[in-house]
From Swiss-Prot:
The keyword Repressor does not apply. It is an enzyme of class 2 (transferase). It comes from the Viruses. InterPro entries: YkvP/CgeB_Glyco_trans-like (IPR055259). It comes from Acidianus bottle-shaped virus (isolate Italy/Pozzuoli). One of its GO terms (molecular function) is glycosyltransferase activity. This is Putative glycosyltransferase ORF315. Belongs to the glycosyltransferase group 1 family. Glycosyltransferase 4 subfamily.
Length: 315
């Protein structure tokens, strides 16, 4: 029987949470067993799978390959990489090393690689559908106006929860799911089922991340027909679906040197106002489009053959 090993470099972050969901899906639908190694950059764990998927950043990938190279020899290995940092080692030959086939799940990253003379193929994330029945609530059935989800870096509010706090102060019913930087009404460490319930019961995903590559919470919100009010910068420029906010400026910020986009306050006010003035009929139509956007681009349920093709259908 085929076994997949997921090498991830997070602990309760987007990489290992996605791997966990994929592992459940693969077992239920393909009878494929999985091994998930979290924080793999900090430890050397025996790789049991004949097939390997690596979830990490372009920055950490060279370190991970160095550590696990011997264990990856002879295995079918695919790396699905992204990074919101400006310190990506774009020209590092390890990204072309045959030990593992490298893809990026970020069109923002792909564009920057191409600009600097390196071709990296793009493939969207394979996300098990958290709403497989496709049930969508209408505008009037949704309890919250806005939701923002994200665990932040320690040195600044990278996920932009402050903007969620602002709409709370303005009188809207909004909620944040956060970790280190939390403002106003918020929740922490939610199980998936509660998080998905929040998506289903919220009108708009407030996508105000200052630095981002494929944002799992935003994409999962689309599965529940929840469109976005989002900053049109970094990866959100490609995956945002709904009402865009203009950036005020783009810079580098944080101890890790993040690509940083600040929000234009006037554009933010206009976008929030447009969202809250939208009619029931127009919203419900947009909600259905958001759901289709997820189904057509990200749903693993609809892309099993494409997933298997990563390994030349040997899985």
């Amino acid at each position: 029987m085929t076994m997949i090993t997921f090498l991830t470099t997070t602990q309760n972050g987007s990489y290992d949470r996605l791997a966990t969901r994929q592992a459940v899906f693969l077992k239920q639908n393909l009878n494929v067993d999985s091994q998930i190694i979290r924080m793999a950059q900090t430890q050397l764990v025996p790789v049991k799978g004949s097939h390997v998927i690596i979830y990490t950043t372009f920055n950490i990938y060279p370190v991970l390959i160095n550590k696990y190279r011997q264990q990856l020899e002879g295995k079918k290995c695919v790396a699905l990489l992204d990074s919101a940092l400006m310190t990506i080692p774009y020209r590092n030959p390890v990204f072309k090393d045959p030990i593992c086939t490298v893809y990026t799940t970020s069109r923002f990253n792909q564009e920057n690689f191409a600009t600097l003379g390196v071709s990296i193929p793009y493939i969207p994330h394979f996300i098990p559908d958290p709403n497989p029945e496709g049930k969508l609530k209408s505008l009037s059935e949704r309890q919250y106006d806005f939701i923002t989800v994200g665990i932040n870096e320690m040195d600044f509010d990278r996920k932009g929860h402050f903007w969620n706090f602002l709409v709370q102060r303005w009188g809207f019913k909004a909620i944040s799911v956060c970790k280190f930087y939390c403002f106003g009404d918020h929740k922490q460490d939610l199980p998936d089922e509660e998080l998905w319930s929040l998506y289903a019961n919220t009108k708009w995903y407030l996508g105000t991340s200052h630095a981002e590559t494929p944002h799992l919470p935003l994409l999962e919100a689309y599965a529940f027909g929840t469109p976005a009010v989002y900053i049109s910068a970094h990866e959100f420029r490609y995956i945002g679906f709904g009402i865009p906010i203009s950036p005020a400026y783009i810079n580098v910020k944080g101890t890790k040197n993040f690509y940083f986009a600040e929000i234009n306050t006037e554009s933010f006010i206009q976008a929030v106002g447009k969202a809250m003035r939208m009619s029931e009929g127009d919203y419900n139509s947009l909600s259905k489009q958001a759901r289709r956007f997820f189904e057509n681009n990200y749903s693993l349920n609809n892309r099993v053959d494409e997933f298997r093709a990563l390994f030349d259908d040997s899985m």
